[in-house]
Amino acid sequence: MYTCGNRKVIPNMPDLILRKIFDQYDYPVLCKMERVCRRWTNIINSKFRKEIHEISIERLGSMFPQAHQCVPFRRLSISCPSDSHDFLAGVFRRSRLSFMKMTTDINFLAGIDQIHVSKDNGRRYFSNVEDLWLLMIHPDDDVTQRFLAIEGTLFSELQQLTLQVHVNPRYYKNVGEIVKSFILRYPKSNINLELHAEKSMHILNQISNLPSLPLYKIKLICTDFDQPQLRLDQLYAVMREQNIQAKNITMRDWSLFADGTTPVSYNPLDTFRISSCSIETVDNLVKSIQMTASQGTHVDGVPPTKKKKVIRKKKETEVVTEEGVLPKPKKKVVKKVVKKKKPIAFIKKLEVAGQCTLHGLTFLQQKAHTELERRLTTLVPGLDVDCSEIYYCW
C-alpha cells in the first residue's frame, strides 16, 4: 500500500473520487502520482487525453525540462533542452494520440526518431494532428535532409499549416525544399506563411526560392527597428513570377513604397492589411489599390458566354369527341432566363492598423486615416476600408 508521510492512501477508491482528487493537482505532480499503481496510471492518462488537445514545444534557451498545462485551452506547454529525449518520450506516451494542434520547430521534427515512441511501423507519429505551426530558424543541410527523410511518417492529414520562417540568406533553398514537401504531402491544407527579416531584399529573395503555391495568408514582418523600405511593385513582380497566390496579405513594421503604376496583387485578395507601417506615398498607394480593384474579373477569369434562349413547343394533338374535333390548344413557350455572373471584387478589404504614419496627410494629425478612407471609397466604391485599429503617438 502506498504511504505519504503518516497517512495511507487507499488505491481502490471509486474512480469518481479519484478524478475529483486529481483535479486539484497540476501536470508535474500528476506525472509522479501515476506511478502509484496501474489503475491510477489509466485514470490519469485518460484525464490527460481529455484535457490536452494542443501541445507547444519550445526548445530554445531552456536549461531544464518544464511543463505547464492550461486546462481551459486544453493546451500543454513544454520547454526543455534539445537533448531531453526521455522527458519528451514520457509526454508522448501519455497523450500523443490526443494532440490535434501542435506548435514546434523544424529541428524537433527532424530529430523525432531519437525519441522513443511506442507505435506500429505503419502508424504516424502524430496521426491526429490537424493544425501545425512550424518554426524555421536555421534549417541547415543536415536538418533539411533528416526532415525530408522522415516527413512522410509525421502527420496523417493537416488541415491548417502555418510556416514561420526567420529568413537567413544561407538557407533560401532549404526553406524552399521544406515548403515544397508540405505542398506535395498535404495539397488540401490551408497554408499560412510568415516571413521575418531585417531587409526587404531577404524577403524577396526567399519568395523567389519558393515553389508555386496557393496561400491563405502571407505575412511579411520586419525585424529591424528603423523600418527599411519595402517596394510593393517588387513584391508584386516576384510573386507573379513564382506564381504565388495569397488570399490575404499582411505587412508589418515596414516603410511601404508604391509607384502608383503597379497593382498590389495579381490575384483576387480578401484582405490587404497594413500594420504599424510608414506609408511613404499615400497618393501612389491609392492609385495602386485602384489599379488592383480595376482588375475585377468573372468567375474562373473568363466572362460568361451568351446562351441562346431555349423555346420548347408542346406537341399538337387533336382530340376527337362525339361532338367533333376540339380546337387545338395554344402553344406554350418556355423561356430559359440566363443570369449574368457578377464580377468578383479583386480586392475586398483594406485594413490599416497599429501605429501608422501616412506621409502627405500628417498635417491632419489624428484625422489622417479619415482622409485616406474618403479617397479610397471615392475611387473604389466597393472596397471595405477599416481603420478602426489605427492609433497615433502625437
Curated annotation (Swiss-Prot):
Keywords: Ubl conjugation pathway. The keyword Hydrolase does not apply. SMART domains: FBOX (SM00256). It holds the Pfam family F-box. Residues 7-51 form the F-box domain. The keyword Disulfide bond does not apply. InterPro entries: F-box-like_dom_sf, F-box_dom. This is Uncharacterized F-box protein ZK328.6. The lineage of its organism: Eukaryota, Metazoa, Ecdysozoa, Nematoda, Chromadorea.
